[in-house]
Amino acid sequence: VIFKAVRENAPYPEHGVTHQRDWSAIAPRQVRLDQLVTTRATLDLRDLLDEDSTFFGDLFAHVVSWRGDLYLETGLHRALRAALQGRTTIHGRVLELDETGHPTAAPPPPPRP
């Protein structure tokens, strides 16, 4: 088993952390693949090539921690590549949500130009 579970969507409420600059405020850490629940069952090239995708921007997967589970929000391609290479972990930015789905420690706002 590569992942803990495979889902078609995210079960948690919209958290509002959507832009690359917001995610970059969260320090990356190692996450075990077998602890991740995916939020999509397929790898769609349109999503992969989107401007806010981790394919072009962030080097780290985006993971949401909610109600005791870790959900792989973006970076499915990175997780699959790691599994194919025989690795059991990836580095990801983990956004912690409270019970209601709000970030427990909201990332600071991006600097103004």
Walk through the language-model features, giving the residues of each:
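A short, basic-hydrophobic beta/loop patch
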Residues: 56-110
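N-terminal leader/domain-start detector
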Residues: 1-24
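Generic signature of intrinsically disordered, low-complexity, basic-rich segments
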Residues: 1, 6, 34-38, 88, ...
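Short alpha-helix boundary/capping and kink motifs at helix termini
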Residues: 16-71, 83
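Feature 3881 marks metal-assisted phosphotransfer/nuclease machinery
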Residues: 113
